[in-house]
């Protein structure tokens, strides 16, 4: 049977030929315009931009300082009214001075309280910051189970049961030496010179010299 025919006997269409890219296609792809990479800024341009940014920042700081001075002047003008001293006698001037001193003392007390609060807050912030740094450098401690201390005998008893006593009796296999045997051995060892003299016949000669 012909391979180009299917089971019904009809002719199947021939597959499309595989087209390969020629060298011309590759050359065309290479010459196509692609997205250009950004150019690097030169050192002189960077220096110029930094100088410009510093100038702008300096102008902003000067403007903010001028605004703060203006706000301070307006606050002082509203709180501290100009004094009217015309037509005041000596006693009235003394009363006015006492009132001004009292106001100054009150303002100093308030300023001291505010400074104390600010110092306390700064100290607390520094302590909290240090605690944060300490916590970052530590590992989180896992929750441990309750530890129950148990002796070695109790542990072996729980593991081995009745065999624990036999296992833990380590001195059972050691050699037992009685005290009497030890004294006898010491006594025998201490008389070794006398035994040698008796065996060699030197005991009588020693008595002659001693006499």
Swiss-Prot record:
Residues 1-43 are annotated as: Disordered. The keyword Membrane does not apply. GO terms for biological process: cardiac muscle contraction; skeletal muscle contraction. The record marks 80, 97 as: Involved in TNI-TNT interactions. Residues 32-79 are annotated as: Involved in binding TNC. Belongs to the troponin I family. PANTHER family: TROPONIN I, TROPONIN I, CARDIAC MUSCLE. This is Troponin I, cardiac muscle. It comes from Oryctolagus cuniculus (Rabbit). The lineage of its organism: Eukaryota, Metazoa, Chordata, Craniata, Vertebrata. The gene is TNNI3.
